[in-house]
A protein has these predicted regions:
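Hydrophobic membrane-insertion alpha-helices, especially the h-region
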Residues: 9-27
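Aromatic-capped interface at the extracytoplasmic side
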Residues: 25-40, 44
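Short, surface-exposed interaction patches in beta-rich subdomains
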Residues: 164-165, 169-257
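Beta-strand elements of well-folded, non-transmembrane domains
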Residues: 60-62, 79-81, 108, 139, ...
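Short Gly/aromatic-enriched secondary-structure transition segments
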Residues: 70-80
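N-terminal Lys/Arg-rich, disordered targeting/topogenic segments
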Residues: 1-6
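Right-handed parallel beta-helix
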Residues: 40-53, 62-64, 70, 86-168, ...
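A cross-taxa feature marking solvent-exposed loop/turn segments within ectodomains of secreted
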Residues: 84-86, 207-208
Length: 257
């Protein structure tokens, strides 16, 4: 009797699974399934002449910061997400006393099917010097290309950070991603930390003076700059501090772009 009841429950469960699967297939074909994807594309612009500090924040997706022509900062959010979530993402830009904040707002915080979301935020900045450029993302990579700033602050929980800049103070932090910073020359302090990723600092011009503080628990440390010895080049100079628990650390001269 008990065995028959268990068999009936098992059959009912299998039947419900089959019905659910068929229902999802039908909904997908009708374009109403949670698995159906849609294209997201939205953009906003803001005047550059009112900006000295720029803060960019998004919880999901990659961030590219690139130089552009013109007099406005241009923010473009594009990618794919489930059709049910298309209205959940929007750009929000605010300005206050010289600081411009660009943020991707996610109205619905909890979804079962967020693994299908693939977004990219591209910020175009005119060729004007910023005091500070700050980029923060929870799950995506960060790339900064030739944008002028006195200070760069990059934070990503799980993504990689890559920078191609002329010079400036650098503060870069990520938990699991790699950090690569390529500069024309090292004239200001650099601080970079990654729990598990490699950290590479590249300079086209060898520094005449430099101080380093390098800490890698299980990774290798490699510095191939000319005249580098025991953590120093010459006397004084900017400080390059690199920290990684399991990643490799490297400072090198390269041929440039």
């Amino acid at each position: 009797m008990l065995k028959n009841r268990f068999r009936n429950i098992t059959r009912l469960a299998l039947l419900l699974i089959v019905i659910g699967a068929i229902g999802n297939v039908v909904l997908y074909m009708l374009g109403k399934s949670p698995f159906n994807l849609g294209e997201l594309s939205t953009e906003q612009s803001v005047r550059m002449d009112q900006t000295t500090n720029l803060l960019i924040h998004t919880e999901t997706g990659t961030v590219d910061v690139v130089p552009i022509k013109g007099h406005e900062i241009k923010a473009v959010l594009e990618g794919k997400t489930t059709k049910q979530s298309l209205e959940d993402y929007r750009l929000n830009i605010t300005q206050d006393q010289g600081q411009t904040r660009i943020e991707v707002i996610q109205d619905s915080k909890f979804r079962f099917f967020d693994i299908y979301t693939n977004l990219k935020l591209t910020i175009g900045i005119p060729e004007t010097q910023l005091n500070q450029l700050q980029v923060m993302t929870d799950t995506g990579n960060i790339y900064v290309d030739s944008v002028l700033a006195s200070e760069y602050r990059m934070i990503s929980d799980t993504g990689a950070i890559k920078m191609d800049i002329k010079e400036g103070v650098i503060k870069a932090e990520t938990n699991t991603g790699a950090i690569t910073a390529s500069l024309d020359h090292i004239l200001q302090d650099i601080y970079a930390i990654s729990d598990t990723g490699d950290i590479i600092i590249q300079t086209a011009e060898a520094p005449q003076a430099l101080r380093t503080k390098l800490s890698a628990d299980s990774g290798t440390i490699k510095v191939t700059l000319p005249n580098y010895q025991d953590g120093y080049i010459g006397e004084g100079g900017p400080l390059v501090e690199l920290i990684s628990d399991t990643g490799d650390l490297e400072i090198e001269q390269y041929s440039g772009k």
